[in-house]
A protein has these predicted regions:
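Membrane-embedded transmembrane helical bundles of large multi-pass transporters/channels
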Residues: 1-55, 163, 167-171, 177, ...
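Structured non-transmembrane domains adjacent to transmembrane bundles in polytopic membrane proteins
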Residues: 63-81, 92-250, 254-427, 651-852, ...
């Protein structure tokens, strides 16, 4: 509409004069319309958090290499990309029972929490132990009973053979007369021999008959030798004093009570020791012969050859000796044995769980490999990790972090421990940033409002006057956040900085617009105009400068909407909408408030309050500038040279983690994790290899293709900045012998494929290589290593035919940051040109001058360079931090928009005075004097509003708040009062120079504007 007024040959003043008529006649309706707009925005306002994003890398362009790699990993690989939650457990030694109890209890607590259904997997070192104990118990149980069966067979061969003969002999003797001669005993022996062997032969496996027949014959021969043919015996002597089992025991094993054994004693060990050539079999037969006994009364009972307890004890002891397991595991192996043969999965699982709960890292009978162990427990054993994987299609993990932390506290209490525990990882960072952003708002906004009320109240000498800007901009913020929700829902995700930056920008700029309008109203009232005329004249003359100022802000942030970097795009759109709403409110609702409340807004003061001391200062400043303009110009230039040198020579930091305060749990956990595991362990860089061939099947691997992938893994490992590599041929960080796959048994082949599986895609044609960087993933050194990896990929493709025909993509958090930086760097140049050209065009149309817009842009760039240099020096030398990489473009955009306000207010007032007939010098002096107080007040309001961002705990907001504070104070108190008048005094008529066509149009507009304003406002 303002442009329409220019097209029709009259200036913007005419448009605002007519707008003022609408406001005067419909002020109450305007109130109602804005209240309705606020009410309509409330439902969207309440949901705005749902469209806020807290990760910078989430704004990575979708067509970037890292974004494409990320999508491939999500689709093809069942592995974390650094987006998992992490529970970090710290202590002097996390291998003890305290960490064990907590980790096990935490697993159970998280799994049983219905609010955490989006957790797909929970993994810690005790999960590894649990799986290993389950497998160990199952395998050992099978081995134990296989060993027991063999032991029972050997015992039966050695002692069962003699036992059968002794029993047969006892039966025969018991059926004979009470007395027996030696000849009769010999007959008993022959009869027992005849009946025993068929029984023995029927029970001995055929493969052992050739071994046992000579052994039996030796036993029978020795049995006969144990009797004296000339002696007389009775049944008592044969069956009780020298019982058959005792006689057989002496023959097989010997009599321990005799110092010298008869030659026919202890035949078992002698026979099997000399008859078996296989050393393993010989060892078993001799061990059984040594351990067991035939006779079970009473001293030999625990070692009775056919006793279950004896078999159990021997089997367990043999297993311990065979496997080299220490005696401390005797009870554990015994419990596995006691499951019985072929136990159910449930019983094995229950035992494994109990062993896990009751044992420790020190005592478990099975240990994971060092590579697997080191993924969960640090080298110094002071830090342990629990990894929480989230479902890809589940609720946002960020919303589960507080519940997880609550469960961590519950698990800590239930386990009876008091460990130092942190929940960190990408979702925790995002949650903590969200919480910190809310805390920042709760901390910053009240201070901002207080400062604005204080400054406006002091400026107007009123308690009521501050309520209009605060209420008006507060309403506009509510409406603007409703629009932000729509942007986040239908256009682009919204960066979390919008929550702080947009309200502050609106409070700063919007309040300036309100103050400028109210101040002009007070000036008109002081000149003797009534309320209606004052509202009309203030809007007519101040409206143009307000719109011009607001248009530069809207344009500056609007250019960011064209950025390829989503973070800048979302901030630009949000603040552009916010300032637009604030501008509309200032031009409609504030004049309506002036119409409704009038002079009562200045209670308890009055409209015409004098401020002689301020007038004197600005008059003196104008006089000083008139006398020393060259000195002012030279001073400004002398400051600009070193400031510019500092800006271009100092670097910036891309470290996302540095933005997160150390006081937050996620940052503290991250710091502990980095100390224990190294900076790149949890957020590795990965290379996706999309091959044209299949890499594996259920029982087959493509060794030729894997050789090329292994070459890529080894090449990556040799690169500076890479500390470890994982991949199909390095599944645990060390190479495996994949080339011998065909020589392995089915079980070993399955195990090898299973170990490779996390790094092989579901399509069977893709592979992933992880590179653990030795520097923090968000640091500049990590980005440098990332660029080297990408360069190495091209080299690999030139050296390997398979890789040359494959697609290789490098992704991960570092890659996302690098791609984001590349996109933002291109945006920086494009946006700088676009915003400066756009602002120049707006000022050219508004001021009808070519030089003055260029001069406005130059002076704001000077103040921006001074502020940037100051912030760099303060950040590096006092705060100990580098400048955040996104700060320069954000500061430029914000200050090209907001920083021009005061210059525009001054220049439009000078132009107004020139239009009314004053000379350039007189107009400059008068404008500086009349606008000094109001522009200073506006500058203090904006500086105060943005300075509250230094109360934030987020580094970027601290630096941005400090930079804007410096720029605004420089612009309002120095540039506008001293430098601008100095330049304009020297340029004289060039201040208003423009091409003839623009100059002629400007004269026509000014002439028509003056005539029509006289008609509209009256010639006062």
């Amino acid at each position: 509409m303002v442009l329409l007024s220019l097209v029709h040959g009259y200036g913007p003043e005419m448009f605002f004069a007519r707008l003022s008529q609408t406001v005067i006649h419909h002020s109450r309706a305007i109130f109602m319309l804005w209240l309705v707009a606020l009410g309509a925005s409330i439902p969207a306002l309440l949901q705005v958090q749902n469209v806020i994003v807290y990760s910078d890398t989430s704004f990575n362009p979708k067509n970037s290499e890292s974004s494409i790699a990320h999508d491939l990993v999500s689709r093809e690989f069942q592995i974390s990309q650094g987006e998992s939650g992490l529970v970090v457990i710290t202590g002097e030694d996390v291998r003890g029972v305290d960490a064990r109890n907590f980790a096990i209890t935490l697993n159970r607590t998280l799994q049983e929490d219905p609010a955490l259904s989006n957790i797909s997997n929970i993994t810690n070192i005790y999960d590894i132990y649990s799986k290993q104990l389950l497998g160990y118990a199952s395998v050992v149980n099978s081995q134990l009973y296989e060993s027991e069966n063999t032991t029972a067979l050997v015992a039966s061969l050695e002692y069962g053979t003699a036992n059968i003969y002794a029993n047969q002999w006892s039966r025969i003797v018991s059926q004979g007369p009470f007395y027996a001669s030696g000849a009769q005993v010999a007959a008993y022996n022959q009869e027992a021999n005849a009946s025993s062997w068929p029984l023995i032969a029927s029970q001995v496996p055929s493969t052992y008959l050739s071994l046992i027949k000579p052994y039996y014959n030796l036993f029978y021969q020795s049995w006969n030798q144990s009797f004296n043919p000339s002696s007389q015996y009775n049944v008592y002597q044969l069956m009780v004093q020298g019982s058959p089992l005792l006689r057989a025991q002496n023959i097989t094993k010997g009599n321990p009570g005799l110092q010298s054994q008869p030659s026919y004693y202890n035949i078992t060990s002698r026979y099997f020791g000399s008859s078996i050539s296989d050393q393993q079999s010989k060892g078993l037969f001799l061990s059984v012969a040594k351990y067991f006994n035939l006779y079970c009364f009473p001293c030999s009972y625990p070692d009775y050859w056919n006793d279950a307890a004896g078999l159990r004890a021997f089997t367990i002891s043999s297993f311990l000796n065979l496997t080299g397991t220490g005696p401390s595991q005797y009870n554990t192996i015994g419990e596995i044995y006691d499951l019985g043969p072929s136990p159910s999965f449930a019983s094995v699982s229950e035992l494994a769980s109990r062993l896990l709960r009751e044992g420790s890292v020190y005592s478990y009978p099975v240990q994971p490999g060092r590579d697997a162990y080191s993924q969960f427990v640090s080298a110094d054993n002071n830090t342990m990790l629990v990894i929480l994987d989230f479902k890809n299609n589940g609720p946002d993990p960020r919303n589960s972090i507080q519940r997880i932390r609550d469960d961590v506290a519950v698990a800590n209490r239930l386990s009876g421990q008091n460990l130092t525990i942190f929940v960190t990882g990408a979702p925790a960072f995002n949650y903590d940033l969200e919480t910190e952003s809310v805390n920042d708002i709760e901390r910053i906004d009240p201070v901002t409002v207080f400062l604005i009320i204080l400054i406006i109240g002091l400026f107007f000498g009123s308690l009521a006057a501050p309520l209009v800007p605060i209420s008006a901009i507060g309403l506009s913020i509510g409406v603007a956040f409703g629009l932000v929700y729509l942007v986040g829902s239908f256009v682009t995700s919204v960066h979390f900085l919008v929550l702080t930056l947009m309200p502050i920008a609106m409070l700063g700029a919007g309040t300036d617009y309100c103050i400028f309008l109210i101040s002009r109203y007070a000036e008109e009232r002081k000149s003797g105009h009534d309320k209606k005329e004052s509202v009309q004249r203030s809007l007519a003359w101040a409206g143009g400068s307000i719109v011009t100022s607001g248009a530069t802000v809207v344009l500056a942030f609007g250019t960011l909407a064209f950025a390829s970097f989503g973070m800048l795009r979302s901030i630009g759109l949000a603040v552009m909408l916010g300032i637009s709403v604030a501008l509309l409110v200032a031009l409609t609702l504030v004049p309506s408030a002036l119409m409704v409340f009038g002079d009562r807004l200045f209670w308890p003061g009055h409209v015409g309050a004098k401020r002689e001391e301020k007038k004197g200062y600005y008059a003196k400043a104008a006089g000083f500038t008139a006398r020393h303009s060259k000195i002012v110009l030279l001073t400004a230039l002398s400051l600009s040279v070193p400031a510019t040198a500092i800006v271009f020579s100092s670097g910036t930091s891309h470290d996302f983690i540095a933005q997160i305060p150390d006081s937050l749990e996620s940052r503290a956990g991250y710091n502990n994790m980095v100390e224990g595991f190294g900076p790149g362990a949890v957020t590795p860089t990965y290379t996706i290899i999309l091959t044209p061939v299949r890499l594996d099947e259920s029982n087959w691997i493509n060794a030729t293709a894997l050789s090329a992938i292994s070459y890529a893994e080894n090449s990556t490992l040799l690169m500076p900045g890479v500390s470890k590599v994982y991949g199909p041929t390095h599944p645990l960080g060390n190479p495996i012998s994949y080339s011998t796959f065909n020589q392995l048994g089915p079980t070993e082949q399955s195990e090898m494929i299973r170990s490779m599986q996390p790094f092989l895609g579901q399509d069977g044609r893709s592979a992933m290589v992880w590179a653990v960087l030795s520097s923090e993933p968000y640091s500049d050194s990590a980005i440098s290593t990332l660029n080297s990896i990408r360069a190495n990929v091209k080299t690999l493709q030139s050296q390997s035919p398979l890789l040359a025909s494959s697609t290789l993509l490098v992704g991960g958090e570092t890659a996302s940051l690098a791609d984001l930086t590349t996109a933002a760097s291109a945006d920086y140049s494009n946006m700088t040109i676009l915003v400066l050209v756009g602002v120049f065009i707006v000022l050219l149309l508004a001021l009808g001058s070519v030089f003055t817009p260029l001069r406005l842009i130059l002076t704001i760039l000077l103040s921006v360079s001074w502020a940037m240099a100051a912030v760099m020096l303060i950040s590096q030398n006092i705060l100990g931090a580098q400048l955040t990489w996104i700060l320069p473009i954000m500061l430029l955009v914000i200050m090209v928009g907001l920083g021009l306000d005061y210059d525009i207010f001054l220049v439009t007032r000078i132009r107004e005075l020139v239009l009314k007939g004053l000379t350039d010098d007189a107009a400059i002096d008068t404008a500086v004097e009349r606008t000094g107080a109001i522009i200073t007040a506006c500058g203090l309001v904006t500086a105060g509003a943005f300075s509250t961002m230094m109360l934030s705990h987020i580094l970027l907001l601290q630096q941005l708040g400090l930079a804007i504070l410096i720029v605004v104070l420089l612009d309002a108190l120095v540039i506008r009062i001293y430098l601008v008048p100095s330049i304009m005094r020297h340029m004289k008529r060039f201040n208003w120079w423009a091409p003839r066509i623009i100059k002629q149009a400007r004269k026509t507009i000014d002439r028509n504007s003056g005539a029509r304003l006289s008609e509209e406002l009256g010639n006062r």
